[in-house]
């Protein structure tokens, strides 16, 4: 397997972060409401992984190194895993597995609906992130996986709705996300490989 060391590093890193959070919860280091803290951190971790996934193609075009693409799918699947953990933690720590409370939560907090839409879209990408699905779907596979842009928008909207007045951190992620979208515009994406051939650009 090519770039096995890079894949291993991504695997260990993505696994270590939630494991560390669970350890912090175990030793009561997550504050007065560790359940909510875990929910928030898993959601933010999923957004970071989504941005990293979207950054792989521009990085490959800028550097010419194929290792970035080698871990793109892995990062995307870890993003889905974090979202799944985020949703599970919400059901356990916020809802207390009281499904009757879910209707009340949805009416009071519409951002949950936005988050669920993002999860459904991400689920579709996760189950089709394999060679069998690529062969079966053909040209439709690329069209389906453009849902990643919608997922980013939904994720940022979900976070904006949650943080409300505290916009400093949200703005940072929004700017990074918008920049990655700009780099994917055909007129800009075509120029990225040329940048590494210019003098002074390695």
Swiss-Prot record:
Alphabetic keyword roster: Cell inner membrane, Cell membrane, Electron transport, Flavoprotein, FMN, Heme, Iron, Membrane, Metal-binding, Transmembrane, Transmembrane helix, Transport
Cofactor (UniProt): FMN; heme b
Gene Ontology BP term (one): protein repair
Entry's localization field: Cell inner membrane
Annotated Gene Ontology cellular component terms: plasma membrane
GO terms assigned for molecular function: electron transfer activity; FMN binding; heme binding; metal ion binding; oxidoreductase activity, acting on diphenols and related substances as donors
Cofactor detail note: Binds 1 FMN per subunit. Binds 1 heme b (iron(II)-protoporphyrin IX) group per subunit.
InterPro entries per record: Fe3_Rdtase_TM_dom (IPR013130), MsrQ-like (IPR022837)
Membrane topology: Multi-pass membrane protein
Disulfide pairings: none
KW Membrane (keyword) present: yes
TM regions (residue ranges): 8-28, 42-62, 75-95, 110-130, 147-167, 169-189
Family to which this protein belongs: Belongs to the MsrQ family.
Subunit description: Heterodimer of a catalytic subunit (MsrP) and a heme-binding subunit (MsrQ).
Free-text function comment from the UniProt entry: Part of the MsrPQ system that repairs oxidized periplasmic proteins containing methionine sulfoxide residues (Met-O), using respiratory chain electrons. Thus protects these proteins from oxidative-stress damage caused by reactive species of oxygen and chlorine generated by the host defense mechanisms. MsrPQ is essential for the maintenance of envelope integrity under bleach stress, rescuing a wide series of structurally unrelated periplasmic proteins from methionine oxidation.
Name recorded for this polypeptide: Protein-methionine-sulfoxide reductase heme-binding subunit MsrQ
Source species: Pseudomonas aeruginosa (strain LESB58)
């Amino acid at each position: 397997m090519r770039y096995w060391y890079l894949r291993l590093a991504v695997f260990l890193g993505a696994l270590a972060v939630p494991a560390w959070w669970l350890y912090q919860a175990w030793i009561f280091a997550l504050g007065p409401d560790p359940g909510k803290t875990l929910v928030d951190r898993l959601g933010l971790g999923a957004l970071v992984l989504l941005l990293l996934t979207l950054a792989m193609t521009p990085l490959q075009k800028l550097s010419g190194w194929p290792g970035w693409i080698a871990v793109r799918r892995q990062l995307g699947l870890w993003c889905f895993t974090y979202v799944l953990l985020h949703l599970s933690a919400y059901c356990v720590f916020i809802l207390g597995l009281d499904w009757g409370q879910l209707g009340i939560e949805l009416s009071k907090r519409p951002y949950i609906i936005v988050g669920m839409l993002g999860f459904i879209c991400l689920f579709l990408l996760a189950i089709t992130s394999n060679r069998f699905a690529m062969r079966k779907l053909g040209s439709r596979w690329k069209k389906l996986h453009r849902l990643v842009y919608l997922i980013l928008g939904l994720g940022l909207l979900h976070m904006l709705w949650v943080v409300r007045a505290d916009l400093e951190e949200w703005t940072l992620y929004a700017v990074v996300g918008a920049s990655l979208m700009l780099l994917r515009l055909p007129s800009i994406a075509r120029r990225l490989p040329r940048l590494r051939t210019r003098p002074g650009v390695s």
